[in-house]
């Protein structure tokens, strides 16, 4: 009788331990899934913000371009117009990152691709903002 009791208790302890190990593995995988979902949400929010900024910049640049097109242009104005056109092309290239990704990132893993796009956006948006500042400064100087 004592032997049967010892075997039964040992079996219960072993099954409880196995269930706790299984629950630990499930909670880890659920935690990983939740972390991945939160990262996707953060990326989605960032993409929406960046999209809004790009749309606003495009609108401002189109307005500036139409102002330059309708008036007489000096050589300096012509140079500024060329810069604006280049900035517009750069902003348009940000709208189709999938095509750029296929050409530029073959063989990279997902993290390297994300870092590449972040660097590319910084590389493009930095000069864009500088150019817009210069254009607005030039307009204010010409108007004043």
From Swiss-Prot:
This protein's GO CC annotations: extracellular region
Q: Which residues form a coiled coil?
A: none
The PTM Leucine amide maps to 143
Is Signal one of the keywords? Answer: yes
User: Which InterPro entries does the UniProt entry name for this protein?
Assistant: Bombinin
The primary location reported for this protein is secreted
Q: Which Pfam family, any one, appears in the UniProt record? A: Bombinin
An example GO biological process term is:
defense response to fungus
> Under which name does UniProt file this protein?
Maximins 7/H6
């Amino acid at each position: 009788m004592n032997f049967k009791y010892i075997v039964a208790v040992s079996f219960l302890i072993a099954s409880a331990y196995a269930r706790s190990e299984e629950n630990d593995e499930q909670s880890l995988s659920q935690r990983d899934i939740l972390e991945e979902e939160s990262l996707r949400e953060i990326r989605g929010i960032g993409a929406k913000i960046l999209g809004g900024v790009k749309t606003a910049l495009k609108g401002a640049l189109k307005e500036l371009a139409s102002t330059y097109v309708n008036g007489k242009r000096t050589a300096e104005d012509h140079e500024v117009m060329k810069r604006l056109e280049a900035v517009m092309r750069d902003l348009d290239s940000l709208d189709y990152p999938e095509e750029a990704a296929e050409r530029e990132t073959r063989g990279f893993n997902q993290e390297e691709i994300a870092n590449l796009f972040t660097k590319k956006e910084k590389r493009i948006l930095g000069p864009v903002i500088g150019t817009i500042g210069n254009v607005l400064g030039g307009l204010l100087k010409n108007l004043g």
